Amino acid sequence: VSKVKNKKMINQIALKSLKARKKRNLIAILAIVLTSVLFTALFTIGGSLIEKNQESTMRQVGGSAHAGYKYLTKSEYEKVAKDKGLKSVSYRIELADAENKPLIKVRTEMAYYEELEAKWSFCYPEEGHMPKKENECVASDLTLKALGVPCKIGEKFSVDFSVRGKKYSKEFILCGWYKGDRVSMSQVMCVSKKLVNQLAPTAESYQYGGDIAGSYMVDFNFKTSF
């Protein structure tokens, strides 16, 4: 194959060719740029939609943890917490469902939540703090609205509930509140650990479908989600 030694001439020909096709080349460049922008936007929007869908599903089921166990005793929880294969473990202790008439259509579960569990369960207070005193509680704005209670720290209100066949009507002080989600199966009222231990000491065993007051609901994340 013969080689052309005059590089200057080749460059001139190439330059003239580019100038002759200037508009066509410009259109091609614009098409490439627009295609790149389109695919970037497509992947960004698609990723955002997937993330929103996942969050919506998590809110419906009431938690973002990878997995969990229900109705455990304290000793069973401690065994799970020691599992080195897990990245993080947290829990809540069940107490009861609120029974006030205004809450018939706004189901509200009462339980003690660890801070991490509250964050996983979308009930960590947006304003205020987690319960510390025996009569403090955190509630959703939806529960408070149904009860006619303003979302204001320090508000006092009574909640009716039953634990192991015994009825209670207790006055709580609002120490925190969060924005509830209507797609959730239930709203949450976080109460103090002292109250739960007082009214519903953890039993030695629990059976599905039985009385779950005092049982540990344990959630955890694996070291990898794959």
Language-model segments: residues:
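Basic-flanked hydrophobic alpha-helices used for secretion and membrane insertion
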Residues: 46-226
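N-terminal Sec/SRP start-transfer signal
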Residues: 1-37
